[in-house]
């Protein structure tokens, strides 16, 4: 039987996976490429070019009112399609209307407001917010923490990039170290139960997976904040336990802020900004704070 030709989006996915880009990048690029095609009434991209790209990007800025970062994201996805998938060089100087970069001052909470919000949370969500505020981690960095990244002896946390390489080291507050140890004891029991059921593997960046073939089953590579459920990997089909989904924490935070009756625009980055501000207020020099971030 002859195999059917692959659809364009499947070709995009193949190239992204060959380059070992993250699953989030794959979803984002696929989303914008589909939007681009639908905007031009399902015309095939190989029959379009600079003029159509500019029209799409202009519409995003003028009619959709997207942020500059969103417009750039769409542009990168489309350029990837032409260069890496269609192998089509574009003589493109983008003359589209550019979305305006929004200038905003980050929200900073007082120490009392941080405590009030933390008190509205419980369990894994409360521990995660304590960690984000106490370390200056981004939400994605906190969710992607592995057991081996936590150094209780030195009271440090290793932060890794998307390829699993060490990018920086930040502090682990002594005030939450014991609570984190107890949490990891519970996580270890869950991991052992998963292994007994024939599961227990965890996602690893490609370079790490290739170098350490059995590492995905090892305790040290498990996520510090695992999901409550095992699920099927959308790329490989392997059933395993991923980390807690960011939407779960964001929903819990939103409810906590409402319960705390704090009238500020608060998101996951707020605790990172507050961490840095409070360190400076406590006498840390700005160079040290920048290194921790």
Model-derived features: positions:
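Conserved catalytic core of the tyrosine transesterase superfamily
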Residues: 1-293
